[in-house]
C-alpha cells in the first residue's frame, strides 16, 4: 500500500505553543468571540422588567451555559471524540457509520443541514451589529449599505484564498479578547455586586419566577452558538491548543458580560435603547471599539465560510451532497473554495440582511437551527461513548442531562419561530431534503446495480486483446468499477468491453474507489488479474480528500513502471522505440433512471427530485478529476424491474 498527502504544503497548527495558541484564537473563536455584541442586547429586548434579579439571573444563565454547554460538553467531552484528529458532526458520524445502523445517518444530516443553515445568519448578524455601533457616533449613517459592502468584500476575496491575511487573524483576535476583558473589568468596578451572578441560584430563581423565562433563555443561548464550530475546527488546531485557549477566551467573555450587566444596572431607564456592548466602552475608545468589532465580525465570518466549505467537502465524500467543483486557492492543506456554495451563501446573507434590516430582528432568526445541531451532536456522542465501552451509567447520564438541557433551549428558541426562526428552519429543511434525497437515491442506484464474477471473463478479455481484427480502442482502457463485493464487476462494464462495441486495448484498468471513515487516508493497492493485460487498482480515500482519479492513477502507474511490474510503452513500433507511453482513455458508465421501469410512486418521486438536485453538481468525469478530452460516457438504463407489459405477436397482418 502507498500513501500520499493531498497537498504539497501541509499547515500544521496542532503543536502547542504561543504561535499555535495565537492561530487557534483566529480560527476557532471568531463566532463565540463576537457573541457579546448582541447577547445582552437580545436579553434586554425580551420585554422582561430590568432589575437586579433579572440581570443577575440572566448573567448567571450565561456563565453556566458557557460552563455546562461549551466547557464540559464540547471542550472536555466532544474534543476527545476525534476522528484521527478531525472533529465536527460529520467526522463523528464517519466514526460511527461502521456500526451499520440504518438510521444513524439521519442524525448526521439533520445536524449538518441545521449547522449550514445557521451559517447563513451568522455573518449577517455579526457584521450588522458591529456597523450599528457607528450609529452612536453618526445616527444617520446608512448601516445597511455599509454592511452589504463589507459582506460583498468578504465573499469576493474567498476565490483568492486567505493564506496571507489569515496569519494576522490570531493577533487581531488576541487584541479583541483583551479589549473585551478590560472594558468589562472597568465596568464591573462600578457595580461589584454583579459578581453574585456566579451563583447558579440567581439563574434558577429567574427561570422559576419569570413569565418570560423562555424568551430570556432563547437570548442567553446565543452566547454558546459558536461551540459547535469549536468542535468542527478540531482538525485545524488540535485539542490542547483549543482547551488552553478556551480558558483565556471564556474569562474574557465572562468579564465582558458582567461589565455589560453592571452598566445596565447603573442605567436601568435607558439600557434597552442602546447596545450595552458599546456603552461600556470609554468614549475616547468608542471608534476604535467599533473598528475592532467590525474586524472581529469579519474574522468570524471568514472562519465560518471556510468551515462550511470543509463541511460540504466532507459531505460530498460521505455521499451526503452532490459533487461540486472545488478549487484550492492556496497550498495550505484543507483551504478550499467552492464557487457555487460561495455564491449561494452570499445571496442568502444579502437576502437575510435585506429581509430583517437590523440586528434586533436577526436575533429572532438566530439560534434555533444550531440548537438542533447541538442536540444531534449529543445523540451521536452518546453512541460514540457507548461504542468506546464507556460505562453505561455515565453514557446515560451524559445523554440524559444534555438532551434535557438542549431540549429546554430548543423549546425556548421555538418561541422565536414566527418572529424569524422560520427562516433558518426553512433553509435547514431545504438542505436536509437535498441530503436525504441524495443518500436515498444513491442507495437505490447501488441496490439495482447488477454484478458478475470477474474471473469468468478473463479468457474473453484476453481473446479480445489478441484479436487484431478488432480495431484498437486505446492503449490503456480505464473503467471505474462500482461493484462493492470483492472479485465482482459491474455487468454493464463487461457489456461495454465485450458486447456494446468490443474494445481492444493493450491494458485494461479497473478502478475501485473506497471512501473510508478516516479523514486524510490516501492509499492504493494494485492487483494483477491477467498478466500484462488486466489490473485492479483499489483507492482508499479519506472523507476530507478530494478524489482526483487522473492524478492518483498517474502516480500508481509511475510506481508500477518503476517497480518493473508493467510495461506501458506504446505497442506502435514508431512510438515504442522512442520509449513513448501508450494513451489512456476512461470509460464512465452512467445509469439513467426511467420512472416507467418502476411501479413504486414514492421511489419515482424521490428519483425525480434526485435528478433535479444532480443539476447543481458536476458530472462524474469532472467529479473524479478526469481530463474530459480522454473520457467517453456511456449512458445505460438503470433497470428497476420489468413490467408485465409485453408486445403480442399476431399471425395475420391487417390489410390497409
Residue ranges of predicted features:
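The structured alpha-helical core of multi-pass membrane proteins
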Residues: 2-656
Amino acid at each position: 500500500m502507498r500513501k500520499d498527502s493531498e497537498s504539497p504544503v501541509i499547515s500544521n497548527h496542532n503543536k502547542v505553543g504561543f504561535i499555535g495558541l495565537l492561530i487557534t484564537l483566529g480560527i476557532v473563536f471568531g463566532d463565540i468571540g463576537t457573541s457579546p455584541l448582541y447577547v445582552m442586547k437580545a436579553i434586554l429586548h425580551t420585554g422582561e422588567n430590568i432589575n437586579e434579579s433579572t440581570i443577575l439571573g440572566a448573567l448567571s444563565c450565561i456563565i453556566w451555559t458557557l460552563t455546562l454547554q461549551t466547557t464540559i460538553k464540547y471542550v472536555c467531552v466532544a474534543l476527545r471524540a476525534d476522528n484521527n484528529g478531525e472533529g465536527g458532526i460529520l467526522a463523528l458520524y464517519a466514526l460511527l457509520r461502521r456500526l451499520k445502523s440504518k438510521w444513524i445517518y439521519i442524525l448526521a444530516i439533520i445536524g449538518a443541514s441545521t449547522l449550514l443553515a445557521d451559517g447563513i445568519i451568522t455573518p449577517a448578524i455579526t457584521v450588522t451589529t458591529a456597523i450599528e455601533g457607528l450609529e452612536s457616533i453618526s445616527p444617520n449613517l446608512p448601516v445597511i449599505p455599509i454592511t452589504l459592502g463589507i459582506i460583498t468584500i468578504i465573499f469576493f476575496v474567498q476565490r483568492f484564498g486567505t493564506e496571507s491575511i489569515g496569519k494576522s487573524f490570531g493577533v487581531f483576535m488576541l487584541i479583541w479578547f483583551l479589549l473585551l476583558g478590560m472594558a468589562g473589568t472597568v465596568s464591573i468596578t462600578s457595580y461589584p455586586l454583579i459578581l453574585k451572578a456566579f451563583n447558579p441560584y440567581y439563574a434558577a430563581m429567574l427561570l422559576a419566577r419569570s413569565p418570560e423565562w423562555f424568551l430570556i433563555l432563547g437570548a442567553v443561548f446565543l452566547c454558546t452558538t459558536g461551540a459547535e464550530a469549536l468542535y468542527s475546527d478540531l482538525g485545524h488546531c488540535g485539542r490542547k491548543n483549543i482547551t488552553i485557549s478556551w480558558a483565556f477566551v471564556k474569562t474574557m467573555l465572562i468579564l465582558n458580560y458582567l461589565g455589560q450587566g453592571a452598566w445596565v444596572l447603573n442605567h436601568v431607564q435607558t439600557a434597552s435603547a442602546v447596545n450595552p456592548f458599546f456603552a461600556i466602552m470609554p468614549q475616547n475608545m468608542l471608534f476604535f471599539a467599533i473598528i475592532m468589532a467590525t474586524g472581529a465580525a469579519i474574522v468570524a465570518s471568514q472562519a465560518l465560510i471556510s468551515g462550511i466549505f470543509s463541511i460540504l467537502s466532507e459531505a460530498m465524500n460521505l455521499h451526503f451532497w452532490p459533487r461540486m467543483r472545488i478549487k484550492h486557492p492556496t497550498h495550505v492543506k484543507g483551504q478550499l473554495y467552492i464557487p457555487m456554495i460561495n455564491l449561494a451563501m452570499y445571496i442568502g446573507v444579502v437576502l437575510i440582511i435585506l429581509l430583517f434590516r437590523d440586528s434586533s430582528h436577526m436575533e429572532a432568526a438566530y439560534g434555533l437551527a444550531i440548537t438542533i445541531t447541538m442536540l444531534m451532536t449529543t445523540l451521536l456522542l452518546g453512541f460514540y461513548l457507548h461504542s468506546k465501552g464507556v460505562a453505561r451509567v455515565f453514557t446515560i447520564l451524559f445523554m440524559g442531562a444534555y438532551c434535557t438541557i438542549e431540549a429546554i433551549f430548543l423549546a425556548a428558541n421555538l418561541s422565536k419561530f414566527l418572529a424569524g426562526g422560520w427562516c433558518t428552519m426553512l433553509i435547514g429543511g431545504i438542505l436536509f431534503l437535498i441530503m436525504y434525497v441524495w443518500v436515498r437515491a444513491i442507495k437505490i442506484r447501488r441496490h439495482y446495480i447488477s454484478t458478475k464474477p470477474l474471473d469468468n471473463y478473463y479468457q474473453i478479455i484476453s481473446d479480445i486483446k489478441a484479436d487484431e481484427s478488432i480495431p484498437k480502442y486505446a492503449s490503456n482502457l480505464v473503467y471505474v468499477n462500482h461493484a462493492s463485493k470483492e472479485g465482482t464487476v459491474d455487468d454493464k462494464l463487461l457489456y461495454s468491453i465485450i458486447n456494446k462495441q468490443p474494445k481492444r486495448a493493450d491494458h485494461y484498468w479497473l478502478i475501485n474507489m473506497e471512501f473510508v471513515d478516516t479523514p486524510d487516508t490516501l492509499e492504493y493497492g494494485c492487483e494483477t488479474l491477467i498478466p500484462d493485460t488486466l489490473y485492479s487498482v483499489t483507492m482508499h480515500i479519506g472523507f476530507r480528500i478530494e478524489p482526483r482519479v487522473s492524478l492518483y492513477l498517474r502516480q500508481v502507474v509511475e510506481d508500477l513502471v518503476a517497480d518493473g511490474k508493467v510495461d506501458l510503452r506504446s505497442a506502435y513500433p514508431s512510438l515504442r522505440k522512442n520509449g513513448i507511453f501508450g494513451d489512456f482513455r476512461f470509460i464512465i458508465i452512467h445509469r439513467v433512471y426511467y420512472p416507467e421501469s418502476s411501479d413504486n410512486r414514492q421511489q419515482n418521486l424521490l428519483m425525480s427530485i434526485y435528478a433535479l438536485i444532480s443539476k447543481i453538481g458536476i458530472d462524474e468525469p469532472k467529479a473524479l478529476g478526469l481530463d474530459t478530452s480522454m473520457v467517453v460516457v456511456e449512458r445505460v438504463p438503470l433497470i428497476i424491474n420489468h413490467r408485465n407489459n409485453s408486445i403480442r405477436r399476431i399471425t395475420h397482418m391487417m390489410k390497409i
